[in-house]
């Protein structure tokens, strides 16, 4: 396996691509949206440092997967994921993993390309222990129930209204200025009856 040492041509190419440099910007999704829109959702530890491929302009991280929540059918006969791929530069939404704790588990939601798991700065990547118990329950079993019929509809400014009875109005950003408000940490948009979805608590019944 070859790591990709920078060359003069590679450095010049990077400088050309990043001038003028523009920061990657994206709106963080509700966790349910991240689950539903991702092809693969796993829990894993980052166990290796980034390896940069100067030709393809990507970097990859070695991981140790501990649990898969979504992606069994997409991965078919190769369910074990050992590497995650991302653009090599933050200006084009490359993800840079900054935690040095190799025993820390992360929830990672990404897309498949040629059998490889890809993520960006805009992907949902979060320390497992930082997530609420409701979010962990959502990724484990509940969010999937809303993927086919329901849509989390972000509301970031007034006025905003639902465009469909299958939409749930997400107001965390509007009310708290954060994407990590009550609806994000404790609720899921799930079918209430045919043709209608509502916010529902992710707390276990009886809790």
Swiss-Prot record:
GO molecular function (one): metalloendopeptidase inhibitor activity
Ranges in coiled-coil conformation: none
Record-annotated site: Involved in metalloproteinase-binding: 37
Chain positions with Phosphoserine modification: 178
Glycosylation site list: 53, 101
Signal peptide: 1-23
Main location group: secreted
Binding-site positions, Zn(2+): 24
Region (Involved in metalloproteinase-binding) location: 24-27, 90-91
Keywords tagged on the record: Disulfide bond, Glycoprotein, Growth factor, Metal-binding, Metalloenzyme inhibitor, Metalloprotease inhibitor, Phosphoprotein, Protease inhibitor, Secreted, Signal, Zinc
Localisation per UniProt entry: Secreted
InterPro entries: Netrin_domain (IPR001134), TIMP (IPR001820), TIMP-like_OB-fold (IPR008993), TIMP_C (IPR027465), TIMP_CS (IPR030490)
UniProt GO cellular component terms: basement membrane; extracellular space
Residue pairs linked by disulfide bridges in the UniProt entry: 24-93, 26-122, 36-147, 150-197, 155-160, 168-189
Record PTM: The activity of TIMP1 is dependent on the presence of disulfide bonds.
Positions of the NTR domain: 24-147
Biological process according to GO: cellular response to UV-A; connective tissue replacement involved in inflammatory response wound healing; negative regulation of catalytic activity; negative regulation of endopeptidase activity; negative regulation of membrane protein ectodomain proteolysis; negative regulation of trophoblast cell migration; positive regulation of cell population proliferation; regulation of integrin-mediated signaling pathway
Subunit field text: Interacts with MMP1, MMP3, MMP10 and MMP13, but has only very low affinity for MMP14. Interacts with CD63; identified in a complex with CD63 and ITGB1.
Known role: Metalloproteinase inhibitor that functions by forming one to one complexes with target metalloproteinases, such as collagenases, and irreversibly inactivates them by binding to their catalytic zinc cofactor. Acts on MMP1, MMP2, MMP3, MMP7, MMP8, MMP9, MMP10, MMP11, MMP12, MMP13 and MMP16. Does not act on MMP14. Also functions as a growth factor that regulates cell differentiation, migration and cell death and activates cellular signaling cascades via CD63 and ITGB1. Plays a role in integrin signaling.
Family of the protein in this entry: Belongs to the protease inhibitor I35 (TIMP) family.
UniProt name for this protein: Metalloproteinase inhibitor 1
Source organism of the structure: Ovis aries (Sheep)
Gene: TIMP1
């Amino acid at each position: 396996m070859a790591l990709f040492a920078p060359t003069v041509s590679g450095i010049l190419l990077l400088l050309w691509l990043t001038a003028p440099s523009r920061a990657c910007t994206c709106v963080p999704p509700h966790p349910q949206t991240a689950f539903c829109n991702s092809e693969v959702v796993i829990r894993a530890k980052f166990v290796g440092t980034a390896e940069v491929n100067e030709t393809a302009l990507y970097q990859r991280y070695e991981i140790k997967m501990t649990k898969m929540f979504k992606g069994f059918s997409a991965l078919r006969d190769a369910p074990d994921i050992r590497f995650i791929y991302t653009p090599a530069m933050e200006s084009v939404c490359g993800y840079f993993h900054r935690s040095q704790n190799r025993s820390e588990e992360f929830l990672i939601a990404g897309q498949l390309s040629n059998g490889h798991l890809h993520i960006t700065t805009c992907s949902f990547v979060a320390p497992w222990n930082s997530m609420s118990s409701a979010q962990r329950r959502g990724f484990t079993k509940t969010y999937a129930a809303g993927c086919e019929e329901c849509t989390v509809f972000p509301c970031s400014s007034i006025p905003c209204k639902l465009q469909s009875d299958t939409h749930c109005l997400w107001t965390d950003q509007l009310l708290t200025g954060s994407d990590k408000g009550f609806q994000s940490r404790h609720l899921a948009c799930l079918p209430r009856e045919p043709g209608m979805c509502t916010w529902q608590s992710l707390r276990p019944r009886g809790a």
